[in-house]
């Protein structure tokens, strides 16, 4: 008898169907987060789309395996601890090294949206630090 294998179906997240407010205490104000990929296993990728109003910045944080941000729209800022804030525009991509202290957010006069990709370790993909 021939052996059949089933091909897994793609997982599709329809835009805007999973938008929720960010957790409290991780930024200067709440912003919208849409989970795209959730895999909290060690080394498993997580991905989300974030939309920030003008001037909203995350607090300083790190990711155990680093982070990639891909800018969708608006003007944003990315800052490595001790370095200058770099302006980001649609189509830009920025990566942060594992455990590198950084923050990112919307420029003062512009909304900002991006996709972030990061891998988890011990069930967590981020460690939030001081403001």
Locate each region found by the language model.
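A short, N-terminal "cap"/entry segment at the start of jelly-roll beta-barrel domains
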Residues: 1-44, 125-131
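Short, charged/polar surface micro-motifs in flexible loops or helix N-caps
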Residues: 41-44, 52-55, 75-77, 122-123
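Structural motif
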Residues: 45-47, 66, 112-114
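Conserved GNAT-family N-acetyltransferase fold
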Residues: 50, 69, 94
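Ligand-binding loop in jelly-roll beta-barrel domains
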Residues: 77, 85, 89-90, 98-125
């Amino acid at each position: 008898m021939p052996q059949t294998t089933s091909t897994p179906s793609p997982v599709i997240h329809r835009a805007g169907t999973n938008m929720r407010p960010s957790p409290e205490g991780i930024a200067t104000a709440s912003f919208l987060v849409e989970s795209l990929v959730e895999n909290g296993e060690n080394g498993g990728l997580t991905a989300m789309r974030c939309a920030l109003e003008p001037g909203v910045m995350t607090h300083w944080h790190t990711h155990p395996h680093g982070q990639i941000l891909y800018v969708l729209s608006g003007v944003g800022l990315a800052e490595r601890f001790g370095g200058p804030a770099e302006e980001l525009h649609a189509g830009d991509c920025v990566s942060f090294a594992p455990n590198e202290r950084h923050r990112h957010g919307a420029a003062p006069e512009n909304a900002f949206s991006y996709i972030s990709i990061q891998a988890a370790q011990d069930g967590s993909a981020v460690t939030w630090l001081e403001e």
